[in-house]
Structures are given as C-alpha cells and as structure tokens.
C-alpha cells in the first residue's frame, strides 16, 4: 500500500498528461514506472495533489486524495482477489480507523492504526461467523492475556491468553456485545465465566484426535445432543436442543487428519466417519472414538445422511481444533429435529451410482430415493448441499 514517489519528474517514468512551463506534470496525467506500477491522478508542479490512483504490477490498486504528494484521508487498497482495505492515511502512512473486507464484501477486520501498525482494540471476523476481539501488542499482533474468541451466536465466548491469534489458555464465558457485527463499540461485557475447564489450541494429528477427548465444546453443547437415530440402522444421530434459523452453525466435525490417498485406498467400512477437508486432507473419527463415552469434544460425526437434508457441511476456523468442518443448517430447524446432511458421494445419470464411489448402503438408498425423481435433481445435489 505504498504511496511514495511523491515528486515526479517527466524523466522518471513514461508520463502522459498536462505539464507546467517547467515541463513538470501539472493537471491530470498518468505515469508508468519501470517497476510496472502506474499512477493516474492530479498533479501540481510535479507533485501529486488531489484525487489519484495507483495501479500496481500485481493488479492491486490504491486510491485516495493526495496532499503535497502524500496520501491523506481515506485510502482504499483493493487486492487482486477483490478484497479491500479501507484506511485512514496521514502523510502517506496508515493512521486511524481501518476496515477490511473479503471479495464478497464481508467485513474481516476493524481497528486502528498508528504509524502504519495496528494498535488498540481490534476486531477480526471469520467467514464462518466467529470473531476475535482484543487489544493488539506493540507489534500489532493479537497477543495478550485478555482476548475473546466469540462464537457465531455472539454470546458464547472463550476468553484468555492468545499468541498471534492462537489460543493458549482460555475459559468459557457468557458475554454481551454492544453494537452489530462490524459496529461494536467496546470489548464484550463478561456476564459470567466458568472456572473450568481450561481450553487450549488442540489441533489433531494423524494419530491423536484430541489431548482432551472428553471436554465438550461449550457452543456445540448448547445446541445439540446425541441420541439413537430415527433413521433405520443408522446408529446414533444428532438432534437440535432448540429452535434455530437457517444458516446456523450447529456442530463441529473434528477428527484425526489423514491423507486423502490413504482414505481412498482403504475399504469403505473404515470410512464411516470420514469427511474430506481439503483436496489433500481428510478428517476421520476412528471407531474407538465413535462412542461419546470415549470422545465428545465434537459431535459433527454423529450427523447422518439424508437425500432431503436440513444441514450441510461447511468450513470452520475453530479456536481449539483449528481448520475443520462444521454442520450448518440450510433451513430452520425445530427443537428435537434430527440433523441430517447429504453425504455427496458421487453419482451419475439418475439411479446409477459409480461402484467405486459410494458404500453399499448409500447405493441402496439412492435407488429408493431415485424412483420418480428427475435426473437433474440428483445431478445437482452435490452443488446444492456440499
């Protein structure tokens, strides 16, 4: 977001535009620099003065108003992916309020800058609905002893010590946030805080699902419970504890992290609680952890399949489990309803399922479901529910 090169002589770049009697840029013009950057804007006797916009070689841009050659006031930096940083500048340096947005226009950061470094109370927003709130340190990092991770319900929190945004130790709290998302005016008011358990960053490995497998997630515990499924031969299922709206995160899907090649090369009987996380990594809940007597840190693996689901899988950046999947509603769900997702095993032309792409129980259900169902519905399921 550099706004330098404030004095521009004609021989410093390829300049096109109005000039003064001394052959300096004066009025509207455009300069192409040897770096590949380009500036279009207003000049006064060789100095940027007035509205202007940098077009950088990496396809990002920076626009705003220039005073005596320096960006002053609101400047808008647009990355090549469409994400935006809207900041206050003083003499070319970020100084004051700043906002950041993802390519879809959702806010991802709000806070303050001093001499180009983040300072004071800052708010970090994640696309899954969670957020981090706290005072950054002198380096602008979210490293302190009073940081709050806020769950999507904006009342359940984990408050404690964080290092560069990673949770070190934290306790469950009930909080009140003043102001809508993106417009909060202060650190959350803590209504109550539990003395235990203490939560820590606990990202799984290929061999360890959790160092504390019997410590449940406080947010998930308020929304769901496991009980025998109403679906025949499905074992346990997951049920809603209360009425919830569409697009509500209900449960988290943590597990050991395996390579996709390993998962794809083993028998389907070993993949009953396995889900893809990325193109390379899958999450798996091994058989010994299926029972809540042995593992209840997350319950997303309890959600069963349906061709008419009320939920879908989504990604989630969890303060304890790291990057995982979650279960999110696709319509309103009532208290006592069983949560279901579409497992999205690959299939083609109506009732025909690729033999190598789905377990037998799924192929049997698909044959039943496929009767009198338009082929295009089946073909589009993966796009609708994954």
Swiss-Prot record:
S-adenosyl-L-methionine binds at residues 234-236, 304-305. It catalyses: L-lysyl(4)-[histone H3] + S-adenosyl-L-methionine = N(6)-methyl-L-lysyl(4)-[histone H3] + S-adenosyl-L-homocysteine + H(+); L-lysyl-[protein] + S-adenosyl-L-methionine = N(6)-methyl-L-lysyl-[protein] + S-adenosyl-L-homocysteine + H(+). Pfam families: MORN, SET, SET7_N. MORN repeats lie at residues 15-38, 39-61, 62-84, 109-131. GO terms for molecular function: chromatin binding; histone H3K4 monomethyltransferase activity; histone methyltransferase activity; protein-lysine N-methyltransferase activity. It is found in: Nucleus; Chromosome. InterPro entries: Hist-Lys_N-MeTrfase_SETD7, MORN, SET_dom, SET_dom_sf, SETD7_N, SETD7_SET. Its main location: nucleus. Residues 1-21 are annotated as: Disordered. The record marks 253, 274, 325, 343 as: Histone H3K4 binding. Residues 1-12 have a biased composition (Acidic residues). Residues 222-344 form the SET domain. Keywords: Activator, Chromatin regulator, Chromosome, Methyltransferase, Nucleus, Repeat, S-adenosyl-L-methionine, Transcription, Transcription regulation, Transferase. Its EC number is 2.1.1.364. GO terms for cellular component: chromosome; nucleus. Belongs to the class V-like SAM-binding methyltransferase superfamily. Histone-lysine methyltransferase family. SET7 subfamily. The SET domain is necessary but not sufficient for histone methyltransferase activity. PANTHER family: HISTONE-LYSINE N-METHYLTRANSFERASE SETD7. Histone methyltransferase that specifically monomethylates 'Lys-4' of histone H3. H3 'Lys-4' methylation represents a specific tag for epigenetic transcriptional activation. Plays a central role in the transcriptional activation of genes. Also has methyltransferase activity toward non-histone proteins. This is Histone-lysine N-methyltransferase SETD7. It comes from Halocynthia roretzi (Sea squirt). The gene is setd7.
């Amino acid at each position: 977001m550099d706004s330098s090169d404030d004095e521009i002589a004609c021989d410093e770049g390829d300049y096109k535009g109005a000039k003064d009697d001394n052959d300096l840029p004066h009025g509207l013009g455009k300069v192409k620099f040897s770096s590949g950057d380009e500036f279009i804007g207003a000049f006064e006797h060789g100095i940027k003065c007035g509205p202007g916009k940098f077009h950088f070689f990496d396809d990002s841009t920076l626009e705003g108003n220039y005073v005596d050659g320096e960006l002053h006031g609101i400047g808008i930096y647009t990355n090549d992916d469409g994400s935006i940083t809207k900041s206050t500048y003083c003499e070319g340096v970020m100084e004051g309020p700043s906002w950041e947005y993802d390519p879809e226009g959702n806010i991802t950061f709000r806070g303050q800058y001093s001499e180009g470094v983040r300072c004071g109370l800052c708010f970090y927003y994640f696309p899954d609905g969670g957020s981090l709130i706290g005072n950054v340190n002198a380096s602008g990092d979210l490293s302190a002893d009073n940081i709050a991770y806020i769950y999507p319900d904006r009342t359940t929190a984990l408050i404690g010590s964080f290092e560069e945004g990673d949770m070190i130790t934290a306790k469950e709290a009930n909080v009140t946030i003043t102001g809508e998302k993106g417009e909060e005016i202060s650190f959350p008011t803590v209504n109550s805080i539990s003395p235990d358990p203490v939560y820590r960053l606990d990202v799984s490995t290929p061999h360890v699902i959790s160092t504390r497998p019997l410590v449940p997630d406080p947010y998930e515990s308020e929304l769901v419970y496991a009980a025998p499924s109403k679906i025949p031969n499905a074992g346990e299922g997951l049920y809603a504890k209360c009425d919830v709206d569409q697009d509500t995160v209900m449960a988290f899907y943590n597990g050991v992290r395996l390579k996709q090649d390993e998962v794809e090369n083993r028998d389907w009987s070993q993949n009953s609680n396995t889900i893809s996380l990325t193109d390379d990594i899958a999450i798996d809940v091994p058989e010994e952890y299926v029972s809540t007597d042995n593992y209840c840190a997350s319950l997303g693996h309890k959600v069963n399949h349906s061709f008419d689901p009320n939920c879908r899988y989504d990604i989630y950046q969890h303060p304890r489990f790291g990057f995982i999947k979650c279960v999110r509603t696709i319509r309103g769900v009532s208290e006592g309803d069983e949560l279901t997702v579409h497992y999205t095993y690959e299939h083609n032309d109506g009732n025909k399922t690729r033999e190598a792409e789905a377990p037998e129980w799924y192929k049997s259900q698909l044959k039943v479901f496929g009767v009198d169902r338009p082929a295009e519905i089946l073909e589009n399921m993966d796009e609708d529910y994954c």
